[in-house]
Each structure stands twice: as structure tokens, then as C-alpha cells.
Amino acid sequence: MQFSFVSLLAALGFFATVRGDLHQLIVGTFGTESLYTLEFDDAALTLDLIGNSTASAASSWIALSHDKKNLYGTSYSTAPAFVSYTLGNATDILYNSTLDIGGNCSSAKAIFVTAATEPPYAVYGTLFGGTSAGCGSVYSVDENGALSELIQNYTYKSTSGVHGVALDSTNSFIYSADDSANTLWTHKVDNTTGELTLVGSVSGPVTGADPRHLTVHPEGQYLYVVLEGANELAQYSIDQSTGIPYFENVTYPLIPSNATSADYWSDEVALSFSNNYIWATSRARSTNNTGYISAFSVASNGKIVSQLFLEPTTSSGGAANASVFRSVAPSEFSDKYVALTDSATGFVEIWSLASNGSAASVVAHVDIDDGGCCANAVVRFDSTPLYLFYESTG
């Protein structure tokens, strides 16, 4: 989920001109067959709902193709499958296809999808829940980027439930966060077919750590993992010869030190536009508590330098059930903005990083209380700059 920030202030006598851009986000849902389009104005700091497109299925996670011309989603409310759409303008979302996952995991739900940024632009999906979620799938795409064929169905282990995956910047390796089996998996990517070969796996740092989501620094030396059960962000180093991550006992809290860990479950992690910061979130299991959002400074090689802050969010982020989710994603052209989605009450917020990085605060908010929103969001469109005029005294 990403935003750009470009602003220009010019004195024109008693008036000033602000040059801002409009950015459109697409937001998925858990329980309604809709894809919402939002528009963020980075000058006026407003966030508006501008489109509601009928979807073929609710999508708990959506991802863009490398060129942003296609959207891929989980088919969350049906038998495990993945869907694809062609994207036109900001609100023109055209359904293409639905492909089942195959294998022996029919009782689970499709939970996560991501797309390669290098040829052959394969799409990867994983499952969660049910009695058998230890399957993953690889899909080819056609010349237009739509899902074409299931080309590989692979397995983790019988107790697995992989809630998130991440490709490295060269698309050489894909890492899987196995929440149910407390394991991190490493697969090698075939750069001709996109198919995967298992390289190895490592257990979570402690029993009940439960890795949920993860991301890889572009330099390829470090992997960042949200530990849902431990409510921590863990930094892993990556073996440069094998690609396998190894834990060096570096973790940071995603809840306050006086909080009861059992009352929370941590969720999301993402790098900022410049890769100088990491954003991460936690959720409360009760609406009586808030969740938290945190940011970290990062060295040029990817090593975490320090935790900058831990701020309470405006809601719990969700109660303890499978249909609750919180997503955080950074902007594409600035470290300043991050989008936070919330399904506990159904909203999307834009948070702004303080100029010195010491805090963050909400600058825009939109409610979408449809009983299923909001899952994650992606940024598809950047429009022509918008010029706003306001009275100036200096």
C-alpha cells in the first residue's frame, strides 16, 4: 500500500499555491464481494471513497502485478482459490479468472497472494485455517497478466498455515511465515518457470512465536518477521550462500512493556519507500484495548538501528477471530505516509511520520462499515497534480 508526496509552496503576493497529487488505493474485504477505490490528496490531506466495484469474491489479501495493470486476490469466501482482475482507470476493475489451488487442502481458505516482479511474473498463493492448510500454489499469467494456469502445487507440513510470503528483490528466493507451525520456510525460485524448490526451514525463535508476516530488505542481508504470538518484530540475517535466514536474537516489542502479551496479536510489517524505515503493527484481542503502530530506523545494509516509537492506534484492530485483520503499507515516493486498514470497525487511515521520525499521527480517515471491510490496500493510480489556493499572510 503506497502513497506519493509531492508538494510545492510558492508565494504569489497575498496567496500561496500548493501543488499536490491525488493517489488512488484499492481495498479488499473479508466478507463482502466488493473492491473499494479510495483517493488520497496529499496537499489537502483528505481520503475519500470514490468507487465500489463488484468483485467475484471477497479478498482477504490483494496484490498488484509488476506493472500495476492487474490485481490478484484471495477468494476468501469460497473453496480455496485465487482471482485476477484487469485494471483500467481508478474505478474500472474487470474480473478475469478464478483458479483453484488443487492438492489436498480443500478445507482451508486462501489467505495470501503475491506476484513476482521479474519474468515470468508468476503469482504465489498460500492457505490458512481448516484441518489441512499446508499447501502452496504457483500460477502462470497470460500475455495480459491475468491468471492462466496452476503450474505447481507444493506442500509445507500437515500442521502448517502460512499467513504471509515475501520475495527477495531479485526474485531468487521466497520466504514463508508459517503461523500455525511456528516455522520460516525458504524456497528457491526457478527464474524460467517461477516454480519453487524447498531449500530449508527454521523454527521460530521460541515456542509460540508464530511468524505471521515478513518482508526482505532489498540488499538481501536481512529479513524482518512479525511474531504474532510473541508480539515482537524479529530481525533475521540471511545466509548469502544458501538464502536461509538465521536468528541472532534481535527482537523489538510491538506492545508496551506493561501490556499482557496474551491480550494482543501482532500483524504486519513493511519497509518505507526509501527503505530507511520499517513500519509494524499489533492488534488487541479485545475492543477494550487499542492496537499499536511502530516504526524503526534502518541502516543502508538493512540492519535495524533503533525503534523510534510505539503509538496506540485508534481502535483495537480486531477481536480474536479469523476474520479480523490490520494492514499497514508505506508510500511509493516518500517515507512520510503509511496507510492503515482496520476490519474491527471498518476504516482506512493515513498516518504521517513526524519530520524527525519520533512519532506518527493520523492525518486522514474514511469509514467503510460494510461488515467485511477492510482487508489490505494497494496503490494503483497517481493522477495529475492538483493545485490548491489558500490565503497567506506572509
Model-derived segments and spans:
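Short loop/turn segments immediately following beta-strands, especially the blade-tip
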Residues: 37-45, 84-93, 138-147, 187-195, ...
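Beta-rich, blade/repeat-based domains predominating
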Residues: 55-67, 102-121, 155-171, 204-222, ...
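Fungal secretory targeting signals
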Residues: 1-22
